């Protein structure tokens, strides 16, 4: 899914410059739902990072190889026949998140499916660290119906899953515009963002595999899968719509 989008200027100087558009390629795949619904759950996890700075490679193990790996683990889980979801899951791996969310902007500017079928966005960005043992679900402030779902999953999750960083607490940063889910939010598509708090290796060349606690990461992946399945099960209730009718057998 190639895209070309305008650069968003950060100040008046940049706004006055003529700059070429940002170009990139999003990667897209899908797992078909079983219920025949045209409502699609879009899972996003950006695959780009900041690249090379001053001759040093920034590998981005947490930001965001961890999110990509989580999305792939979810896709693998749902692709097994016994785990087939009710709704179709569209897996989008945006390019250019580190450059003005350009991949997500390009996806919604030219989606492969009608925008009105994109019912929900679940975004994975930085799930490997949780140095304090906490995984955050950001978005319930904008969709209060998500809070009981998060609490329900948290009660069974293998990690300390918490709701916040979405404008609900003035003492916390607001992550609503901090990753690809922001583009869905601006297009009135409900979202939930799973991620961890910043850590000393964030956007540093030390964000490497060796600094990831594997046990914590795997527990975060398991929790993310639980969240995705809960959204699939409860999507109509979250959206205030009638429940899906059970598919009839021919």
Task: Tell what function each PLM region has.
Residues 1-31:
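A non-catalytic alpha/beta surface segment that caps or lines the substrate-entry region
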Residues 27, 39, 64-70, 74, ...:
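Stable alpha-helical elements in mature extracytoplasmic
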Residues 12-18, 54-64, 93-94, 132-141, ...:
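Second-shell loop/turn segments in exported
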Residues 33-40:
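Proline/glycine-enriched tight loop/beta-turn segments at coil->beta junctions
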Residues 1, 73-83, 109-113, 151, ...:
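Sec-exported extracytoplasmic/periplasmic mature domains
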Residues 27-29, 43-101, 224:
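Alpha-helical metal-binding/catalytic segments enriched in His/Glu/Asp
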Residues 199-250:
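His/Asp/Glu-rich mid-to-C-terminal helical/loop segments that flank catalytic regions of hydrolases
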Residues 36, 94-193, 197:
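Metal-dependent peptidase/peptidase-like ectodomains
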